[in-house]
Amino acid sequence: MAHKKGASSSRNGRESAAQRLGVKRFGGQRVNAGEIIIRQRGTKFHPGDLVGRGRDDTLFALAAGSVQFGTKRGRKTVSIVPQQ
């Protein structure tokens, strides 16, 4: 039995780097405009008040305030409560 494989063979791909997805700022935490709140694939969380959605579904703050999680029409949402 040969211990070398044929010319066009591979020994499996290497493991890819983690994508570092998830919640970056939790409920009640203060954020500034532009700060990333959640990195996600797809819309597991939907943007609420004063929250924007990036091309890759990242949710970010549009204004300074505190993060608030909730539900609207059966969907999980993330909103910003503006600072007084």
UniProtKB/Swiss-Prot annotation:
Biological process, per Gene Ontology: translation
Pfam families xrefs: Ribosomal_L27
Superkingdom, taxonomy of origin: Bacteria
Entries under InterPro entries matching the protein: Ribosomal_bL27, Ribosomal_bL27_CS
Alphabetic keyword roster: Ribonucleoprotein, Ribosomal protein
Stretch list, region Disordered: 1-23
GO-annotated molecular function: structural constituent of ribosome
A GO CC term attached to the entry: cytosolic large ribosomal subunit
Record bears the keyword Protease: no
HAMAP family, per the entry: Ribosomal_bL27
Record family assignment: Belongs to the bacterial ribosomal protein bL27 family.
Protein name from the UniProt record: Large ribosomal subunit protein bL27
Organism, scientific name: Salinispora arenicola (strain CNS-205)
